[in-house]
Amino acid sequence: MPGDLPYNHSMSNDFLSTDPYKGVRDFYPEDMAIQQYIFDTWSKTTESFGYERYDASVLEPASLYKSKGAVNEEIVNDQTYTFTDRGDREVTLRPEMTPTVARMIAKKQKELAFPVRWYSIPNLFRYERPQKGRLREHWQLNCDMFGSDTVAADVEIIALAHQLLL
């Protein structure tokens, strides 16, 4: 039929696969509508608590994760998508957002008015064995408050989490 592409559900030399990379998924329009509704709800709720949205590149220097120490050694050594780019730099697809937001806060700490309330809905990647309900690519809501170590700050985060569940 005119316009048909040489695709096949299975990999062979003559056809391209219609399956996504193992551990990730495609988002068709109906899936995107659901995801967008969830993200919009998260954003509206989080912003009602005074949090501002931020984001960053999915690529980070691999050293950012290696410097976190032995606590995350398994993630750094076994569960990251790390590669050497054309400039001979070791790069990682971010497996979590904490090192990235800490880097961003540190860079602008003299310009920021603390406490800082930021949130993100990052796309994250972990190279682990896909299993039911757990993929290599996922999104999550991160809500961070920097510059306050009070009980009130803890209560605020708990109240925010509670509101998100309603």
How should each PLM-predicted stretch be described?
Residues 7-166:
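TRNA-recognition modules of translation machinery and tRNA-sensing kinases, especially anticodon-binding
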